[in-house]
């Protein structure tokens, strides 16, 4: 029996090797053949210099000739895909509907200060980490990362018996010790949990492999239960976070504390997979970082690489549709320019606009109903939306005693029930029952802030929302949604500010202005369907091994590819993985192997120095 199993295993390995060679052994240039990192140059603060990179408005004369690809959307998924292709010698045009490139990495001005739109903190940005290495290669090492304070996160539990605080310290040992100090009677549970997090997170390469292998093969492996049997990551993708914590025997309060980070992926513990949660915990466990100079530095240092290869990144370029030829293959895009449409032709179209925008709005009506398109859409639904609050403060971080720590404020240990009650409430009552708040001080995270904005500071807060509360105004123009809309939005803002001022009483009299952005704001500026913060919902259905294998860069439409967070996971690093998967599919190269080889080469060179 065991001999038969061994022979079958060997046969499977041979088949996998041949399939892999056939799919990813092309002769495309290696974009990661050489280390392009160089010492960071001084921060560019000149507004005109930054505008030339980040705000190149669309015009026909600025469209490069003989394009190799067009990318829809300039978030990190789109920019990274374009940059990798540019490094392989491709001429790529990136089209952004907003006035500024960057997607969730762009910044905007409010009352003379700068706010980020989506980058609150990133993990594993120390020298030597793979995420840092990838970003160094697409920005030539010009992104500098500032470490945040330890604890990087502070969970605050407001209850009938007062306030409890649970710090999350940088460093695995310190992180675990911090938990055990708060839960001395549950040390064994904490040890089991942390070991499971480590084992599952290390298996994330299995999720990548699922998207590399032919779909029929992954379906076969899934059908016979081989994925969940041999892969801890795939197995954890079929178990909810709540289920795992209950099996470990954690108390209700410990379950809440271990689940505190769920707003970073937008799904409550009973509805998300433990695999995703483990990835996020492992991502931050060594500490958190913030881009020096703010999140717009990411786009600012990625775009020049695209331009040097003959490409361009153009803003104010709303793509109306993906063009198809007579054989049903993507062959370009149609861009709205004033009242006219401009057709741009190219052999490859990459969409960073997300699955819903791409399949439901950018494709011709007949193609939207293709069985394979409908199958993919049936696996996902729009994710959680949030209300953003942007607060301008008078005073430095020292004056105001502000830390670079993030604050997660909860009012109930049963996060699932609290959220379910909240989102099912009538919109008029909901502001009185906000279940959680995320609070951060971006100005305290950036070491260049004081030089750029002396004697002033910023605070941001995020509040979960039901899109249905704002749905009636979605057809109304921005800025003209009426008194009822503003009243509802302000009710959430005022309720949040009441909590914030109790937590930070030193800010009394220091608040200069408060601005709220509803899910409709997200929908308008980021083209996020239903204002979804993280694209497709990161629930158990989406993270099931079958769905992970099915949702990939290649689409049912030849020459049309997806990139970004919808084909891997949310966040900067998730979208970056989506870009690598997309670029690998287009170049027919395993870029992960290329990066690994370059990393080994760089390490060997450093040893000789």
Swiss-Prot record:
**Annotated catalysed reactions:** all-trans-13,14-dihydroretinol + A = all-trans-retinol + AH2
Predominant subcellular localization, coarse grouping: endoplasmic reticulum
Q: In which tissues is it expressed?
A: Predominantly expressed in the liver (at protein level). Also expressed at high levels in kidney, intestine, and white fat and brown fat. Weakly expressed in heart, skeletal muscle and testis and barely detected in the lung, brain and spleen. Up-regulated in the liver of diet-induced obese mice, compared to lean animals. Down-regulated in adipose tissue of obese mice; this decrease could be due to the impact of inflammatory cells on adipocytes.
The organism's taxonomic lineage, starting at the top: Eukaryota, Metazoa, Chordata, Craniata, Vertebrata
Q: Into which EC class is this enzyme placed? A: oxidoreductase
In terms of PANTHER family, this protein maps to: ALL-TRANS-RETINOL 13,14-REDUCTASE, BLR7054 PROTEIN
Species name:
Mus musculus (Mouse)
Keywords associated with the record = Endoplasmic reticulum, FAD, Flavoprotein, Lipid metabolism, Membrane, NAD, NADP, Oxidoreductase, Signal
Role: Catalyzes the saturation of all-trans-retinol to all-trans-13,14-dihydroretinol. Does not exhibit any activity toward all-trans-retinoic acid, nor 9-cis, 11-cis or 13-cis-retinol isomers. May play a role in the metabolism of vitamin A. Independently of retinol conversion, may regulate liver metabolism upstream of MLXIPL/ChREBP. Required for adipocyte differentiation in a 3T3-L1 cell culture model. This effect seems not to mimic the in vivo situation in which animals show increased adiposity in the absence of RETSAT.
Q: Membrane topology type, per the record?
A: Peripheral membrane protein
GO BP terms:
retinoid metabolic process; retinol metabolic process
* Family listed: Belongs to the carotenoid/retinoid oxidoreductase family. CrtISO subfamily.
Q: What induces the gene encoding this protein?
A: Up-regulated during starvation. Up-regulated by PPARG.
Q: Which domain of life is it from?
A: Eukaryota
A GO molecular-function descriptor? all-trans-retinol 13,14-reductase activity
EC numbers: 1.3.99.23
Give the UniProt entry's GO cellular component terms: endoplasmic reticulum membrane; nuclear membrane; nuclear outer membrane
Leader sequence segment = 1-25
Required co-factor(s) are: NAD(+); NADP(+); FAD
Which protein, by its recorded name, is this?
All-trans-retinol 13,14-reductase
Kindly list the places in or outside the cell where this protein is found, as annotated in its UniProt entry: Endoplasmic reticulum membrane
